[in-house]
């Protein structure tokens, strides 16, 4: 995943949080930066806020003991609002103002608990107070009691929905302290021993003492809290996970995100704890409404009322090596189905590919969402067939732009390594039983009619299960048979992807240079080189192709690349083709109308399939076999390279190229005089002998490497 994609995923999560959650998350991230980074961020913030007059007014009020004392005369609703806006602006060291806040907080919390009002606002106040650098150890210890009472009230309010009281109390009392105590904040080695938490000065940014962080002494044994609290996700709200109506501030119970999050790619490590929980039928209250991605910001945890013990032992395939599930969160995000990430986190790749609509219905997934999930999974099964179709299009000399766009879309989907030890012994015995229920969703959770529907669905989906793990006997396509290319087994999606990348490489090497296509191709390779589904051999091939394309790209005169856009516009005006170069047939006929000479303009574009370069049994394509014998094509190979249809990335497919091939009578080495004679004034692209030699050298190198490596993994592009 590219950096900008990672930032996009993080920004998506960030937008879904409330202000308190955003503050807590940023604070957690800032504790991981170096002193220089922290100082730089401080300068940026100070500069951007220098002219914020309203903020300066609020800050003065927030640090004035007299003004804070006057708030006691206001209504509780107004006081809560004032505290939420002013408490974060309290300056460390202002003891008088802090004392006033500590007088108000217990009153507000007691009122909220007694009348069961402003529960979420009270949580936010506790969050700010417990992480604020101005509060001391004694202050936080006193607030711990209110945290206990607050969670007790929450548990009592919603305890009728299969939720035990003890779980909520234990979690509320211990979660904050233990995730702070057990977190590894010694990442940069610049903590101090103050109990001020995190302050604006770099020297006081972090504090750490033996057995205590931010002044917190552990109140309970860390063994009482599952280890998953310290290892998964960014925030959690187990206490309210069983309630039928979702409050917008649901996750603010998590006062600080865990510190020791594993180093996972963004989109996996940033999944919240609730998004990574199982949501099985045994965890759902009978009166729970169907889940909906639009129900709330935190609806991904709405259906779970599981216990902390379940979280500690729950399997998370998103973080398992070789599971093929690491890209599922990002894939669901692109489908706007990321609220259901928890549903997939307990599945294997094969179980996900075998999902049916009835199984999703048993999990209380809404009708629209489950229909979209089933359709999306069906598209995943069709990826290998799509790759074969793209391969045929590329061989026939079609545009490269569309295949490259398809490949970019495909790499965002989950891809599992073919034939890995984790799938071979387990997945293959279940091949004929693809519709069978995954382990997460047993058959007992379905009605008889759903089972019949699942069987029917599986029967229709299995034949196209390209990458689903349900391997079917491969039928040799006409294209594969004609080209005598050894077919790849069904399910070998990385191998098929690599083969298509090789075809694209060959097309790029022999066609007119296109900066956009080359850049897109190199980005594809960069993403594949770090993907776990691809073998080392495949990655070596991809790296080799990347180097060839880069070398060829650098060998082209920069003037040619800069003039391509203007050149295309002129050609479009002359031939009436939008955003594409003319085919050989149209070029010949168009010049014939304006010029009695029947020779075509020398082109640096090289066709791929039409020149018969992609076959292994003979260098003759299907169209050329009908008109020309193989020896003739071999003899005219070099002439055809430069005068046949420019089948580059911007060419339109043409079946009439055989009628306009260059004749033998024209010399192989066209002189500059002849070149100028045949060219029209608007078609002035420099074609020099060194350019031709460089192109031939790169093409020969590519063909040789592909041919020599064809016997290893059968992903040759030749």
From Swiss-Prot:
It is found in: Cytoplasm; Cell projection, Dendrite; Synapse, Synaptosome. GO terms for molecular function: mRNA binding; translation repressor activity. The modification Omega-N-methylarginine is found at residue 573. InterPro entries: PHAT_dom_sf (IPR037093), SAM (IPR001660), SAM/pointed_sf (IPR013761), SMAUG/VTS1_RNA-bind (IPR050897), Smaug_SAM (IPR037634). The keyword Translocase does not apply. GO terms for cellular component: dendrite; P-body; synapse. The modification Phosphothreonine is found at residue 424. Keywords: Cell projection, Cytoplasm, Methylation, Phosphoprotein, Repressor, Synapse, Synaptosome, Translation regulation. Residues 453-466 have a biased composition (Low complexity). It comes from the Eukaryota. One of its GO terms (biological process) is nuclear-transcribed mRNA poly(A) tail shortening. SMART domains: SAM. The modification Phosphoserine is found at residues 168, 420, 580. Residues 278-310, 417-474, 572-601 are annotated as: Disordered. Residues 323-396 form the SAM domain. Belongs to the SMAUG family. Acts as a translational repressor of SRE-containing messengers. This is Protein Smaug homolog 1. It comes from Macaca fascicularis. The gene is SAMD4A.
């Amino acid at each position: 995943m590219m950096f900008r994609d990672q930032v996009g995923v993080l920004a998506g999560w960030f937008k879904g949080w409330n202000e308190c959650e955003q503050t807590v998350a940023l604070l957690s991230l800032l504790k991981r930066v170096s002193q220089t980074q922290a100082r730089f961020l401080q300068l940026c913030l100070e500069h951007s806020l220098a002219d914020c007059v309203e903020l300066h007014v609020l800050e003065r009020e927030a640090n004035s003991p007299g003004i804070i004392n006057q708030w006691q005369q206001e209504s509780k609703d107004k006081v809560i609002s004032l505290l939420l806006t002013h408490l974060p602006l309290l300056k460390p060291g202002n003891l008088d103002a802090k004392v006033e806040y500590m007088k108000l907080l217990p009153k507000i919390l007691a009122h909220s608990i007694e009348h069961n009002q402003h529960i979420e606002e009270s949580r936010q106040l506790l969050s700010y107070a417990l992480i604020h650098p101005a509060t001391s150890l004694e202050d936080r210890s006193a607030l711990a009691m209110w945290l206990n009472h607050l969670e007790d009230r929450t548990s009592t309010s919603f305890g009728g929905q299969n939720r035990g009281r003890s779980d909520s109390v234990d979690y509320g009392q211990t979660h904050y302290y233990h995730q702070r105590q057990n977190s590894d904040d010694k990442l940069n080695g610049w903590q101090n021993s103050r109990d001020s938490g995190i302050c604006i000065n770099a020297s006081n940014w972090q504090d750490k003492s033996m057995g205590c962080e931010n002044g917190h002494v552990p109140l309970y044994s860390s063994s009482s809290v599952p280890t998953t609290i310290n290892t998964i996700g960014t925030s959690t709200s187990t206490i309210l996970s069983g309630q039928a109506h979702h409050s917008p501030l649901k996750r603010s119970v998590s006062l600080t995100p865990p510190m020791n999050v594993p180093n996972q790619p963004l989109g996996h490590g940033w999944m919240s704890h609730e998004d990574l929980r199982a949501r099985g039928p045994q965890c759902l209250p009978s009166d729970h409404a169907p889940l909906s991605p639009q129900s709330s910001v935190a609806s991904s945890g709405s259906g779970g009322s599981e216990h902390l013990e379940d979280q500690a032992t729950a399997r998370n395939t998103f973080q398992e090596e070789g599971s093929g599930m690491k890209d599922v969160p990002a894939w669901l995000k692109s489908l706007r189905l990321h609220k259901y990430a928890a549903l997939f986190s307990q599945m294997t790749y094969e179980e996900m590919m075998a999902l049916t609509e009835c199984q999703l219905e048993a999990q209380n997934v809404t009708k629209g969402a489950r229909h979209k999930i089933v359709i999306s999974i069906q598209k995943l099964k069709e990826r290998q067939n799509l790759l074969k179709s793209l391969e045929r299009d590329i061989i026939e000399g079609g545009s490269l732009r569309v295949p490259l766009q398809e490949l970019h879309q495909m790499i965002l989907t989950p891809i599992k390594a073919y034939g890995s030890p984790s799938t071979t012994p387990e997945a293959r015995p279940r091949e004929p039983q693809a519709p069978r229920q995954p382990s997460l969703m047993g058959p007992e959770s379905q009605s008889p009619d759903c089972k019949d529907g699942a069987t029917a669905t599986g029967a229709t989906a299995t034949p196209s299960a390209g990458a689903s793990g349900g391997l079917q006997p491969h039928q040799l396509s006409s294209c594969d048979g004609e080209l005598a290319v050894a077919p790849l087994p069904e399910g070998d999606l990385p191998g098929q992807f690599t083969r298509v990348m090789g075809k694209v490489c060959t097309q790029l090497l022999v066609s007119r240079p296109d900066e956009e296509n080359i850049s897109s191709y190199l980005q594809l390779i960069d993403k594949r080189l770090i993907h776990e589904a691809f073998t080392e051999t495949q990655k070596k091939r991809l790296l080799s192709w990347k180097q060839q394309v880069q070398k060829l790209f650098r060998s082209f005169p920069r003037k040619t690349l800069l003039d391509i856009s203007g050149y295309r516009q002129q050609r479009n005006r002359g031939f009436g083709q939008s955003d594409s170069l003319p085919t050989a047939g149209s070029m010949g006929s168009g010049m014939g109308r304006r010029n009695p000479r029947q020779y075509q303009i020398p082109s640096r574009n090289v066709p791929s399939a039409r020149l018969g370069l992609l076959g292994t049994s003979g260098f003759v394509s299907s169209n050329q076999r009908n008109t020309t014998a193989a020896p003739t094509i071999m003899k005219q190979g070099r002439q055809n390279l430069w005068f046949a249809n420019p089948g580059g990335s911007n060419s339109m497919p043409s079946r009439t190229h055989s009628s306009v091939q260059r004749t033998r009578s024209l010399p192989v080495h066209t002189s500059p005089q002849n070149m100028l004679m045949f060219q029209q004034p608007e078609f002035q692209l420099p074609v020099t002998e060194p350019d031709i030699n460089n192109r031939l050298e790169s093409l020969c190198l590519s063909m040789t490497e592909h041919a020599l490596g064809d016997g290893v993994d059968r992903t040759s592009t030749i």
